Amino acid sequence: MTPEPLEIDRLDRGVLSLRGPLTMENVSPFLNAVRREDAPTVILDFTGVPYLDSSGLGSLVAASTSCAKAGRRMALTGVNKRVMKVFEITRVEQIFLMFPTLSDALEAFTNAGTA
């Protein structure tokens, strides 16, 4: 079976829209896209991510750590119930800054002066 691709679109400086599952097959392109961003805050729009596996979860933690080491923040938006359940079971939802929508995240960071 051919793995489903993960499409990553750069919507704006620091804003990446993801479409497709975040799985073992897609970890490298995902991490590369996050590391290429030079904005003070990297916002990952998860609206199009139906699920993730343990490798995808690990890559999110790695991306968050990479951003923190570089003095940047990472936020997630549009996380569906299935993905949120994985976050809750593994308790990683506590380490991610999350917003219901991309608009909410952009507004929060614009008001804080860090978008």
What are these regions (language model features)?
Residues 2-32:
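STAS-typified acidic loop motif
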Residues 98-115:
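A charged, well-structured terminal subsegment
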Residues 11, 47, 103:
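Conserved catalytic submotifs in the C-terminal HATPase_c
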Residues 7, 35-36, 101:
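Serine/threonine-rich low-complexity intrinsically disordered regions
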Residues 22-96:
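Amphipathic alpha-helical interaction surfaces in cytosolic regulatory modules
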Residues 9, 77, 99:
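General small-molecule cofactor/ligand-binding pocket signal
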